[in-house]
Amino acid sequence: MTPEMLYALRDQAGVPSHPVVFLILGVLTFALHIAAVQVMLGAASLTLRGAFSASQHWRRLAAAMITTAKIAVSVAIVIGVAPLLFVQVVYDPFWYTSNVLSAWWVIGFIVLLILGYIAMYAFYWKNHDIVADGGRGGVWMVLSIALLLAVGFIVHSLTNQMLFPEHWMAWYAPQGVVNPDGHSLHYWHLPRFLFFIALSAPVTGAWLYGYRRYLQGGQEADAAYLGWLRGLAQNLMLVGGVVSVL
């Protein structure tokens, strides 16, 4: 891939404002999107942990977190459109090429997202009263988390691929043989991906603080539950923060 080819792929109309504006908006909207993703991962994990526990505190938390996880997926999808559009505005030739190189995964990303959301709702439908009855159908929540993580990994890989135009030709025509099937993901950076996943722990801890504050504002009478929530939130923020840094 030569600079001349990249120039040829540019939109001749240009961008409607200075690129810095779109870069800043892209970072801000991505931060909101990834925060929703991390809340979703944390809430789904807490739901899975708590629904099958004998502890009433854990079960009560699971009942609240399944609702949080469902809403967080919706928020992540809606807000995620904005940074994607900003990426396309600024880096369109790079993003387009990366998508073409892994076209099957671009379509698969949408399918996996839909299936992951359906699996989460399947768990929700099977558990009308987690506090009283405990959890049922845990395999659905495990499947949901796995599929949503796969969705994140696909986007992570596509984003990394667009950063290395010097490798595009080798990926498209390995050893000089053109391979246009789009079946492969060609590049990823696992530590970077795991870093964003690990951040879900401290972010979820902060979310639990907000949840605890919400209960206090509603005159929650169960002081033991509030104290337990505070301890769990502190542990998630402390341990999760250390793991993320390492």
Task: Name each model-derived stretch.
Residues 1-30, 57, 61, 85-105, ...:
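Membrane-interface interhelical loops and short amphipathic "cap" helices
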Residues 29-42, 72:
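Functionally critical transmembrane alpha-helices in membrane proteins and complexes, commonly lining
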Residues 33, 65, 195:
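Divalent metal-coordination and catalytic microenvironments
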Residues 37-47, 107-124, 194-212:
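Hydrophobic cores of alpha-helical transmembrane segments in multi-pass inner/ER membrane proteins
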Residues 40, 65-68, 72, 76, ...:
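Small-residue packing motifs within transmembrane alpha-helices
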Residues 43-68, 85-97, 123-136, 206-235:
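Juxtamembrane membrane-water interface segments of multi-pass membrane proteins
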Residues 72-143, 245-246:
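Membrane-interface helix-loop-helix modules in multi-pass inner-membrane proteins
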Residues 129-246:
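Long, contiguous internal "core" modules enriched in hydrophobic/ aromatic residues
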